[in-house]
Amino acid sequence: MMKKIDVKILDPRVGQQFPLPTYATSGSAGLDLRACLDDAVELAPGATTLLPTGLAIHIADPSLAAVILPRSGLGHKHGVVLGNLVGLIDSDYQGQLMVSVWNRGQQSFIIEPGERIAQMVFVPVVQAEFNLVEEFDATDRGEGGFGHSGRK
């Protein structure tokens, strides 16, 4: 079942010059977000910048959130990833979707107007309430943390 999410177009080029986010295939999890820029932006090695998408969403359902994730090709081929690694969009947020990009590569990268820069995935949310305890029931793992199970 397709969930309906309210979206506002903040830049008139979205839906005209720049396509609205859509799923590329019936099995796609993410919707591509585009850089809603007037001019190309040069992202120097090590630099970060905040890019507008021209869209605002209001999820409204507290059992849902959206995450903004990098596009694998930009990171692998060009070293361009999200500046905050993952963006979290809460259900009650109503502002413009902005994407923080970071060039961790060795070469400058040019971001063109309308270029696909990130992807957005809707995820279920469970809000939890903490139950204060003095001790936990014992488990096989216990406090075993990073690397406790080995590499093979």
UniProtKB/Swiss-Prot annotation:
It comes from the Bacteria. GO terms for molecular function: dUTP diphosphatase activity; magnesium ion binding. Its cofactor is Mg(2+). Substrate binds at R71, S72, G73, N84, L88, I89, D90, M98. GO terms for biological process: dUMP biosynthetic process; dUTP catabolic process. It is an enzyme of class 3 (hydrolase). Pfam families: dUTPase (PF00692). Keywords: Hydrolase, Magnesium, Metal-binding, Nucleotide metabolism. Gene3D superfamilies: 2.70.40.10. InterPro entries: dUTPase, dUTPase-like, dUTPase-like_sf, dUTPase_trimeric. Its EC number is 3.6.1.23. Pathway: Pyrimidine metabolism; dUMP biosynthesis; dUMP from dCTP (dUTP route): step 2/2. It catalyses: dUTP + H2O = dUMP + diphosphate + H(+). HAMAP family: dUTPase_bact. This enzyme is involved in nucleotide metabolism: it produces dUMP, the immediate precursor of thymidine nucleotides and it decreases the intracellular concentration of dUTP so that uracil cannot be incorporated into DNA. Belongs to the dUTPase family. This is Deoxyuridine 5'-triphosphate nucleotidohydrolase.
